[in-house]
C-alpha cells in the first residue's frame, strides 16, 4: 500500500520514528541500527515501508533502503517469524552479516539476536538459504569478512539513550554524539563517547 514515505523527521527513538508529511505524522517502527544513521529532527527523510495488517492493528515498518525492506518482507515469511522478530534480526545484523550467517549455517551468530534460539536459527537457515541467494541484493562474493556485531553502531545507540535519559532532547543528543564521534578513534568505547559528547551539549 505504501512503497515509501518522504517528509520531515519529527521524532525518533531506538524503535520508532515519526515522519511529518504535510502536517500528517506517520508512525513507523524501525530497526535499532538506524538510530545513528537518521538525520536530525526537522530535516528531510525518506523511509521505504512495509504495511502490515493484523486483526487488531495496522502497522508501518520503515527502512532507509529498499534492500532492507525486501529482506524484512522475506524474513516475515519464514515459519514462526513475525514482524517483531524480523525487525530484531535486521536491527542486530547487517544484510551481509545475515546472508553470511545463513550461507555458513552459523547458528551462534543468529542466536546472538534477542529472541532467536537454536530452533529458530536452524529454521532461518533452512528457509532463507535459497531466497537470499536468489534476490541478488546482497554480496555473494567469496571475499567474506569475519562475522561480528557492529560495536560502533551499538555504542552510538547506547550513548544516544544515555543522553536522552540525562534529560537532553534528541536533536541535542544526536548533534553531540556526531561531534564526539569525530574526535574519537575508529574503535569507540561507550564511556568515552558519552564523556566526549557531554562536552558538546
UniProtKB/Swiss-Prot annotation:
Cell compartment(s), UniProt: Cytoplasm
SUPFAM superfamilies (alphabetical): DNA helicase RuvA subunit, C-terminal domain, Nucleic acid-binding proteins, RuvA domain 2-like
InterPro entries cross-referenced by the UniProt entry: DNA_helicase_Holl-junc_RuvA_I, Hlx-hairpin-Hlx_DNA-bd_motif, NA-bd_OB-fold, RuvA, RuvA_2-like, RuvA_C, RuvA_C_sf
Segments of this protein annotated with the region Domain III: 153-201
Cross-referenced Gene3D superfamilies: 5' to 3' exonuclease, C-terminal subdomain, DNA helicase RuvA subunit, C-terminal domain, Nucleic acid-binding proteins
Stretches assigned to coiled coil: none
Transmembrane segments: none
Protein name: Holliday junction branch migration complex subunit RuvA
Organism: Protochlamydia amoebophila (strain UWE25)
